[in-house]
């Protein structure tokens, strides 16, 4: 794009989940290195459609602007991605922007990801430290374990993997690849391993690992390139092992 060009955005808007959605088009002055967040900020400063109609600023979630917080995930030209790293010069115009479809809409592009956080609580996705604060340094972790764990720790809970997963729908409570990857991460930690059986038991229930259909869309959509399919396979293996041992032991 050259100087003087316009950026055309078509944004899907709605006041809440219960309200009907509508589309509004905006024409913005192009600037070098514009991303979608910059476009949304420009609209907020001057909320006027391309037809000259006064409207309200578009509601959206954003924080870090460097693909770390995970809050700005949305559908951009039909693809689940982070708005802060979506450069206008690399997008086909008009740019169509929609809220993610697998989460309830709060307003406009802002969605409620509470389902993900409830799933993380369900699988105890944390390291228990109560009573260990006075035990000195934590347990040592082998370098090879660190190398496997670090990519898993990069999850930003953006929800992209749930958005592209066909198993996450109105008829299924599938928790999504990010959750199982966190189970794998915390089960690898020496302290977290104390609750490994509880986590695996949690993913063996409704919406758990058995509901994965191996579509593998998740690993392609992950902005942090987390090996989600490896995590799904590993958690599936751990679940089968725990189930068989439980059956044999009785």
Task: Name each model-derived stretch.
Residues 3-9:
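Short structural boundary motif marking the start of a folded domain
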Residues 16-21:
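Short N-terminal binding/cap micro-motifs at the start of the first secondary-structure element
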Residues 22-35:
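Short, contiguous acidic and Ser/Thr-rich linear segments
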Residues 34-56, 95-250:
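Ferredoxin-type iron-sulfur electron-transfer modules in oxidoreductases and energy-metabolism complexes
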Residues 62-66:
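Serine/threonine-rich, repeat-prone extracellular segments and beta-strand-based repeat modules
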Residues 76-98:
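Glycine-rich phosphate/adenylate-binding loop and adjacent beta-alpha elements
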């Amino acid at each position: 794009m050259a100087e003087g060009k316009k950026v055309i955005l078509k944004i899907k808007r709605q006041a809440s989940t219960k309200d009907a959605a509508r589309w509004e088009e905006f024409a913005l002055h192009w600037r070098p290195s514009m991303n979608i967040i910059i476009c949304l900020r420009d609209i907020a400063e001057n909320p006027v459609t391309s037809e000259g109609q006064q409207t309200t600023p578009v509601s959206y979630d954003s924080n870090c602007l460097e693909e770390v917080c995970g809050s700005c995930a949305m559908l951009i030209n039909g693809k689940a991605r982070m708005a802060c790293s979506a450069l206008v010069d690399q997008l086909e115009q008009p740019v169509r922007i929609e809220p993610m479809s697998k989460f309830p809409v709060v307003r406009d592009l802002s969605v409620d990801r509470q389902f993900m956080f409830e799933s993380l609580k369900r699988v105890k996705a944390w390291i228990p430290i109560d009573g260990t604060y006075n035990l000195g340094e934590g347990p040592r972790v082998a370098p090879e374990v660190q190398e496997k764990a670090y990519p898993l720790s990069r999850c930003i809970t953006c929800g992209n993997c749930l958005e592209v997963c066909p198993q996450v729908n109105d008829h299924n409570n599938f928790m999504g690849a990010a959750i199982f990857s966190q189970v794998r991460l915390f089960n690898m930690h020496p302290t977290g391993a104390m609750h490994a059986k509880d986590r695996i038991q949690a993913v063996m229930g409704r919406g758990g690992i058995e509901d994965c259909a191996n579509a593998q869309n998740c690993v392609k959509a992950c902005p942090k390139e987390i090996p989600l399919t490896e995590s799904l396979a590993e958690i599936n293996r751990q679940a089968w092992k725990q189930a068989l041992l439980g059956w044999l032991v009785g």
